[in-house]
């Protein structure tokens, strides 16, 4: 596999945590022999090394190995607390209260639902408010829910199949009432299309918010580096990076070329946070080296990483989400 960044491995966790990295062949061999294996607590470091960027060919098999790790009686720090929050609030957080301020102009009823996600509405509300304002500015007809149920990604990516199935069942009952569901988060978009749709009675269409992006009507300027989305590009949406870059260029920005690499946020900030931080720090160095005025993205998890680590790493480009750059 050709290196996209000279001297760096394409698989992010192989780059930052090579002693615990499992290759595709390693994973396939474990799957073949899993009925004869009993995982021990120390296997956590290898099995939860993955940040779920979708770069490898064995993402689903890695999830099965996590399920077996838990079934074998092992523990993951913080997971029980997350599950308790889920039982109470249907989110991985100790609340299901949205922290967003609902902009005027969103109708109470529509055949299109904008599903924002737990991270977006609870942890990064300003990012989410700007996405709402952007859709309103584009005259998109949509509504939002008073409260959302987690899409299931934290449980799916942790190996907790029971909790994921609950999310799936309860959300399907809601989504079947809509013709279209616009997703703000690529993990939600992935789960809804691949795992929800086959179980749905309706013909609900799931779209990603990048499908609604257009060049700004106001002429913009400045150099922009973009963190494109592993969870779209590695899961069947090749070309979205070129489309977004083209929109920025037509808006007046100069797009700074930065070879694609994971930001570390694909899993969310949980479990092997030491690995996530190492990946994030390396990615911030890419933006700093490339220079420019702004660093941007159109993924909530990437934005959480970019907003946080651009400050911690004191990189030169200022972090601004794509909606802010285009409004």
Annotated model-derived regions:
Residues 4-6, 207, 212-215, 223-236, ...:
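Catalytic cores of enzyme domains
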Residues 8-190, 195-200:
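Iron-sulfur-cluster electron-transfer modules
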Residues 119-204, 233-239, 245-327:
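Cofactor-cradling patches in redox/metallo enzymes
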Residues 107-112, 218-224:
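A short, charged/proline- and glycine-enriched loop
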Residues 117-118, 209-210, 229, 322-323:
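Fold-independent oxyanion-binding glycine-rich loops
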Residues 1:
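N-terminal glycine-rich, Lys/His-bearing helix-loop that initiates the first secondary-structure elements
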Residues 66-69, 202-214:
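Short, structured interface segments
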